[in-house]
Amino acid sequence: MKPRIAYRPLHGILLLDKPAGLSSNNALQAARRLLRAEKGGHTGSLDPLATGLLPLCFGEATKIAGLLLGSAKAYDAEIVLGVTTDTDDADGEPLRERAVPDVSEADLQVALAAFIGRIQQQAPIYSALKQGGEPLYAKARRGEVIDAPVREVEVQAIEVLGYSAPRLTLRVTCGSGTYIRSLARDLGEVLGCGAHIASLRRLWVEPFRAPQMITLEGLATALEAGAEAQTVLLPIEAGLADFARIVLDAALAARFRMGQRLRDAAFPTGQVAVFGPDGSPSGLGLVDADGRLSPQRLFNGLNEISVC
């Protein structure tokens, strides 16, 4: 019988390089077991086929996981033209094969231009979006007819990295909720031949533009060699880099952590990250036009429990 894992309070962010073939939740649980972290969450699913950056939040850092979910992201996608699948990627069953037309790079640029900016995009039927309280993929696996939702998403940029028919490689920078599988599927229809994702790698997630990622194997090796968790975890404040910053003195920081509102005309308006005099994050707040700072998410126990 295997000994039970002794989990511990642990606060920080792990920039995991997710392997292909593993769901985001399974990747999270594997990292959580290795770190022996009591509480963890990821910041938005990567498809099992996809690799690359999956920020994992542990302990008090889970309170900002939803904020990272809404961040901009970038991907490298290899697309195969001429074949559609039921999942819109290589993990699915082929549905239809069509001849790939003679497409020049200029033709590609014209076609891709329609997908840049704010666009309406229909989610894949094999997705984690819920309908009637159930993920779409569960309905799809039962063979149910699904009317996947159409949502507005934003694509900031698409760069052609390479094209040799039938394979096309793109770099896509996009906002939250964008499905690269849907983009590939829809591009294939515009070109008249269909398409699916062959491989997908997430390069970065705001604010981690140049992430030093670690694999599960690398994490296991480092911990077995005696590395402390703080050498592989980023502090919570690393995830707050895009927020306006307010530093309070000890008395005001204590009041803020107790949930009290504060007022100062010098406070920047909007959502802010609040820090104590020692530089440790106290939480997130919202400042209105009158300079009133209202606590939104408070970080607890960071001074009492170190990342170790």
UniProtKB/Swiss-Prot annotation:
Question: Any one Gene Ontology biological process term?
Answer: mRNA pseudouridine synthesis
Q: Name residues in a coiled coil.
A: none
Q: Which reaction does it catalyse?
A: uridine(55) in tRNA = pseudouridine(55) in tRNA
Active site at 47 (nucleophile)
What keywords tag this UniProt record?
Answer: Isomerase, tRNA processing
Where do the TM regions start and end?
Answer: none
Q: Report the superkingdom from the record.
A: Bacteria
Q: Does the keyword Oxidoreductase apply?
A: no
Q: Which GO terms describe its molecular function?
A: RNA binding; tRNA pseudouridine(55) synthase activity
Give the signal sequence positions. Answer: none
**UniProt-listed Pfam families:** TruB-C_2 (PF09157), TruB_C_2 (PF16198), TruB_N (PF01509)
Q: What is its EC number?
A: 5.4.99.25
Q: What class of enzyme is it?
A: isomerase
Question: HAMAP family from the entry?
Answer: TruB_bact
Job description of the protein: Responsible for synthesis of pseudouridine from uracil-55 in the psi GC loop of transfer RNAs.
Family per similarity comment: Belongs to the pseudouridine synthase TruB family. Type 1 subfamily.
The protein's matches in PANTHER family, at most eight in alphabetical order, are given as: PSEUDOURIDYLATE SYNTHASE TRUB1, TRNA-PSEUDOURIDINE SYNTHASE
- Protein name (record): tRNA pseudouridine synthase B
Q: Which organism is it from?
A: Xanthomonas oryzae pv. oryzae (strain KACC10331 / KXO85)
The organism's lineage is:
Bacteria, Pseudomonadati, Pseudomonadota, Gammaproteobacteria, Lysobacterales
